[in-house]
Amino acid sequence: MSAADKVKPAASPASEDPSAIAGNISYHAQYSPHFSPLAFGPEQAFYATAESVRDHLLQRWNDTYLHFHKTDPKQTYYLSMEYLQGRALTNAVGNLAITGAYADALKKFGYELEAIAGQERDAALGNGGLGRLASCFLDSMATLNLPSWGYGLRYRYGLFKQRIAKEGQEEIAEDWLDKFSPWEIVRHDVVYPIRFFGHVEISPDGKRKWAGGEVLNALAYDVPIPGYKTKNAISLRLWDATATAEDFNLFQFNDGQYESAAQLHSRAQQICAVLYPGDATEEGKLLRLKQQYFLCSASLQDIIFRFKERKADRVSGKWSEFPSKVAVQMNDTHPTLAIPELMRLLMDVEGLGWDEAWAVTNKTVAYTNHTVLPEALEKWSQAVMKKLLPRHMEIIEEIDKRFREMVISTRKDMEGKIESMRVLDNNPEKPVVRMANLCVVAGHTVNGVAELHSNILKQELFADYVSIWPNKFQNKTNGITPRRWLRFCNPELSEIVTKWLKTDQWTSNLDLLTGLRKFADDEKLHAEWAAAKLASKKRLAKHVLDVTGVTIDPDSLFDIQIKRIHEYKRQLMNILGAVYRYKKLKEMSAADRQKVTPRTVMVGGKAFATYTNAKRIVKLVNDVGAVVNNDADVNKYLKVVFIPNYNVSVAEVLIPGSELSQHISTAGMEASGTSNMKFSLNGCVIIGTLDGANVEIREEVGQDNFFLFGAKADQVAGLRKDRENGLFKPDPRFEEAKQFIRSGAFGTYDYTPLLDSLEGNTGFGRGDYFLVGYDFPSYIDAQARVDEAYKDKKKWVKMSILNTAGSGKFSSDRTIDQYAKEIWGISACPVP
Ligand code: 475
């Protein structure tokens, strides 16, 4: 049956009346010609509903654009190669406060809103924490009415879909645009030329200019981002690469040379084909650099266009005004090319001199660091850079030269440090540009993402710069949006919170959650809290059954670790712990087993396609699960499940249903973590190390409500040295767990290389670099404390309540408010 058979179509702008909304949905089903008008299945219902909601968004988005144009406030532009948006429908109707109206409207067609929302594909234009942080930030920027936009790339295929096969993880292209995205608006009026390769021309008056090479176009797609209960909607502008008709060689085509006729078109397609193309080859590296430049150049041309558009007289200059109207935030070093690109546009296109251009650039750009892992600090080959971006390389060389001169002339005492602080590393074997150094030298502010991480930046990674620019360095502890990560993903718990706080204002003022503390021992609250958790656990159990076929018991302790698979995050320690638990259960008498706290250990996450040890870890979790879950002696007390294809919408099911969550990285290595905040907010207790934001979470929720173990960050270097010097004595339990795997208890796959990475000096020559062996005994002891605590239901529910109550600090509204005041210098600009 078609939508029109059920509800009369109406083009009227959507209102908040369910009948009018139903008419509007029916209208979109009929007149947005994506599907046959005869059928109205759940998929069609999703697209028609989304288009109807988009009408609301567009109204706000247009109003906001005009309001910003008229009032001309200072505006922030967030440059990020990644956004992990996930699904948008539930969030959009929630933020617009029209969830009930849309739920009622859909009932007229016989549909539940939740089921229709489940039809949407995740927009996974990011890898992990950094990308999801960018998405939480957009939600907070809109909610706080801040004049700010995000810029990114419109990848054709997002983060790969993960399938678990016999050999382990398989990657499949994630086709989020398979049909189309109802949320994006293609902007044929917003197009900028982007040049690659070519050469630098010098005119008779000595002016330098980039010319030649090939020129593609950047075409804008706008995704409106609604704030929570505000009229403001901001923009996430995603760039796609295109070539023009002029680039199509009709002569060659008619001559049968089809491929060479459309060469530039196919090169344009490559730019935004995939998120993070493999960079093991030179081609892969070049493509990644092209992507980065494409984002930076298109965004800066657009920013300059808008700067001029908002006041007619800016066409003729007033560049010193630019930093009072524009703030550019670089999300890690991936958009570092914004620095030389802004310099180039100001000097070569707008005609400024170096000093003037440098002053403007320096006052405009700021840099957030998200990692201290040496292998994750970007370095680009000078040769590749020279070939692809010859004019930018000149500018970078000049920045490097001037920085050296400045240090030599003003800081004699720092001379010995210059080589490591320089932007260029001229090591003859492999000359590179150090992108983080460029960001520190050129930006006005550098920030880390949690207290501990920011201190490590100041004391270690960037210590030398601190002595030159003591005021450049800041901390901005990460946050998460309480809308998506409690209000919308956990409606049961949200209702309880609202009921006990007697207000739902916590949704945009998360500090109000502390008001729950005074009810932490209230038996009525305990009963409601436990019932909500059980409902979420059942939903989680259904998801697990659907995607893995494994039945798990909602009365067991749900213990979850979900995040990218990485050795520093130590999923391997988790699974060794599960193996040890399994072995002890096997050795126990049946009577003793009955005293054990039943547990379901769940692990989820994607391994980078070429990261061999991470893929081995995925395989090991699956292999351990296959044995344990089918062992009738013990599977009442332990299940081990690998959750495939972890993504934002899976997180929205898993986090509310978890009770214990693992954040167990080697201290000093996880810059912040943000899922730790989501778990804690949803009343889940953390077992973790003193790393990243765990430190601050533990402070906020109280040390009794956090299971702490492991070495501290300042011990790690010494422990590694001891280990190298043969001073490490492994705990017998650690040896036992490894030996059990080596014995073949979990199948015939060869885990030797993985386990060897935990031994002496064999792990890539750095022997258990992540200190699994050192932390294992205290981890096992902490897990034993968890088992005991869980037996006391009252105690556990209280810990759970106090975790939620102590999570107020971790709202991204707080984080963004601090960025706005302390880095960007922008203020709210609400649409009247
Ligand atoms: C940290 N991703 C978390 C989170 O601040 C932190 C790196 C290279 C290329 C592509 N993506 C990346 C990251 O570095 C990343 O996700 N970093 C994470 O940023 C937000 O909470 O501790 O590991």
From Swiss-Prot:
Its EC number is 2.4.1.1. Belongs to the glycogen phosphorylase family. It catalyses: [(1->4)-alpha-D-glucosyl](n) + phosphate = [(1->4)-alpha-D-glucosyl](n-1) + alpha-D-glucose 1-phosphate. PROSITE patterns: PHOSPHORYLASE. The keyword Magnesium does not apply. Disulfide bonds: none annotated. One of its GO terms (molecular function) is pyridoxal phosphate binding. Keywords: Allosteric enzyme, Carbohydrate metabolism, Cytoplasm, Glycosyltransferase, Pyridoxal phosphate, Transferase. The modification N6-(pyridoxal phosphate)lysine is found at K678. This is Alpha-glucan phosphorylase, H isozyme. It is found in: Cytoplasm. Pfam families: Phosphorylase. Its cofactor is pyridoxal 5'-phosphate. One of its GO terms (biological process) is glycogen catabolic process. Phosphorylase is an important allosteric enzyme in carbohydrate metabolism. Enzymes from different sources differ in their regulatory mechanisms and in their natural substrates. However, all known phosphorylases share catalytic and structural properties. Its main location: cytoplasm. GO terms for cellular component: cytoplasm.
